[in-house]
């Protein structure tokens, strides 16, 4: 899910979810 994806990205980058999504783009 998006929530789980956000948690994974947050752990990998250690940055805010918004910044991570901006880098990854929309993984919809």
Swiss-Prot record:
Gene3D superfamilies: Phospholipase A2 domain. It comes from the Eukaryota. This is Basic phospholipase A2 homolog BmatTX-II. The keyword Transmembrane does not apply. Belongs to the phospholipase A2 family. Group II subfamily. K49 sub-subfamily. Snake venom phospholipase A2 homolog that lacks enzymatic activity. Shows high myotoxic activity, neutrophil activation (demonstrated by activation induction of IL-1beta production), and slight cytotoxicity against Jurkat (leukemia T) and SK-BR-3 (breast adenocarcinoma) tumor cell lines. A model of myotoxic mechanism has been proposed: an apo Lys49-PLA2 is activated by the entrance of a hydrophobic molecule (e.g. fatty acid) at the hydrophobic channel of the protein leading to a reorientation of a monomer. Expressed by the venom gland. It is found in: Secreted. Keywords: Disulfide bond, Myotoxin, Secreted, Toxin. Monomer. InterPro entries: PLipase_A2_dom_sf. Its main location: secreted. GO terms for cellular component: extracellular region. One of its GO terms (molecular function) is toxin activity. SUPFAM superfamilies: Phospholipase A2, PLA2. One of its GO terms (biological process) is phospholipid metabolic process.
């Amino acid at each position: 899910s998006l929530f789980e994806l956000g948690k994974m990205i947050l752990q990998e980058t250690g940055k805010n979810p918004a910044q991570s999504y901006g880098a990854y783009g929309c993984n919809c």
